[in-house]
Curated annotation (Swiss-Prot):
Pfam families: PPTA (PF01239). Its EC number is 2.5.1.60. This is Geranylgeranyl transferase type-2 subunit alpha. The keyword Repeat applies. Catalyzes the transfer of a geranyl-geranyl moiety from geranyl-geranyl pyrophosphate to proteins having the C-terminal -XCC or -XCXC, where both cysteines may become modified. Acts on YPT1 and SEC4. It comes from Candida albicans (Yeast). Belongs to the protein prenyltransferase subunit alpha family. It catalyses: geranylgeranyl diphosphate + L-cysteinyl-[protein] = S-geranylgeranyl-L-cysteinyl-[protein] + diphosphate. GO terms for molecular function: Rab geranylgeranyltransferase activity; small GTPase binding. The gene is BET4. Heterodimer of an alpha and a beta subunit. It is an enzyme of class 2 (transferase). GO terms for cellular component: Rab-protein geranylgeranyltransferase complex. Keywords: Prenyltransferase, Repeat, Transferase.
């Protein structure tokens, strides 16, 4: 039994039939591969060659050499740089986008499919026929199917960047695009606190949005209202307000999934990024209060975990060490306090894979904290 699915034990006859069937598939695959390699060696860029690459890439989308050959076919047989009509090339590129989309739905984590789609779009850019808004809709739907897909999030940032380039002289529109992305990360995180890519995207968006607002305010000598009522903009009037908002948001994640590193990594970023720490320069005690509040919260979660599981939570202990180290640094005192030592000793017991690291930290032979 694996993931709730009962394994079916094949009879000897069924095994033999399966083996015969697999051998036929392997033979056909090798034959098709040899045919395509021969076509490429002969610099054959025909429609028939393109169809052959279709057949092989449907079977094996990881075969990046075939994607390379496919691009050679498109350029040599259809590209307007080879005296072909722009409309013909545009049509074939859009057909290929459709082919790629079908493959992405079946293999959403295959890098080479995403890579080929980017290439197709840049070819359309050369023709002045790319539709980034449509592409934005495509990647949004793909992320709805798999909201934690790293490739999908990376591709979404790529699309957003190109949408920004199209409106580079309209900073208000650029701001709206990024605020919409910020709100999108909020929705995705609320659905799944383990969505590392959404948290990561948030760390990129927050400084960017804040800087956009600051630039506009400096240029026009006005407050944030110059942007109208853009959803979410009110949070960015003050970094401390934004920090408190996000600390409140991740509190749920800490309580629900203390074993999930995504939430902890985002917490570390919130507590150490210059955007937030610089805002506390004239209010140092407020920063210390926040650190102590977070330490108390994590200690409470750890106590609840001990009641439920009978032992400390690794994520909680590591975070308690991290925040204690921040507090000691702010006070210009040694990091290796008795509480930190106690946490390290517990970690050495419950996290044996990293036991030697914790022991080195206890002995002062490895740093406790990097900042």
């Amino acid at each position: 039994m694996q993931h709730g699915i009962k394994r079916v034990k094949l009879s000897e006859e069924a095994k033999r039939l399966k083996l015969e069937k697999d051998q036929i598939k392997i033979k056909n695959y090798r034959q098709l591969t040899d045919e395509i390699f021969e076509l490429r060696a002969n610099e054959n860029y025909s429609d028939e060659a393109l169809i052959k690459t279709n057949e092989l890439l449907i079977i094996n989308p990881e075969f990046y050499t075939i994607w390379n050959y496919r691009r050679e076919i498109l350029i040599n047989n259809y590209s307007s740089s080879n005296d072909k009509d722009d409309q013909i090339y545009e049509d074939i590129l859009n057909q290929d986008l459709n082919f790629v989309l079908v493959q992405l739905k079946k293999f959403p984590k295959c890098y080479w499919i995403w890579n080929h789609r980017r290439w197709l779009l840049f070819e359309l850019v050369k023709l002045g026929k790319v539709n980034w808004k449509y592409e934005f809709g495509v990647v949004s739907k793909l992320l709805d199917l798999d909201q934690r897909n790293f490739h999908g999030w990376h591709y979404r940032r790529f699309v957003v960047k190109n949408m920004e380039l199209e409106c580079k002289n309209d900073t208000t529109l650029i701001l709206k695009i990024n605020l919409d992305e910020f709100n999108y990360t909020t929705l995705k995180i609320q659905k799944d606190f383990s969505n590392f890519s959404a948290w990561h995207n948030r760390t990129k968006l927050i400084p960017k949005i804040y800087n956009l607002i600051q630039q506009q305010q400096q240029q026009q000598q006005k407050d944030g209202k110059i942007f109208g009522d853009l959803p979410g903009i009110e949070l960015f009037q003050n970094p401390i307000l934004l920090l408190k908002n996000d600390l409140e948001m991740i509190k749920t994640g800490v309580y629900m999934s203390p074993e999930d590193t995504s939430v902890w990594l985002y917490l570390y970023w919130l507590l150490t990024d210059d955007l937030f720490t610089n805002a506390f320069k004239s209010h140092q005690q407020d920063y210390m209060n926040i650190l102590h509040e977070q330490l108390q919260l994590i200690n409470e979660v750890n106590e609840m975990e001990k009641e439920d599981t009978g032992q400390d939570n690794v994520g909680c202990l590591k975070s308690m060490i991290f925040i204690n180290a921040l507090i000691q640094n702010e006070n210009n005192k040694p990091v290796l306090t008795e509480q930190v030592k106690s946490c390290l000793k517990q970690l050495a017991k419950i996290d044996p894979l990293r036991k030697n690291k914790y022991l080195d930290q206890l002995a002062g032979n490895a740093p406790i904290f990097h900042h």
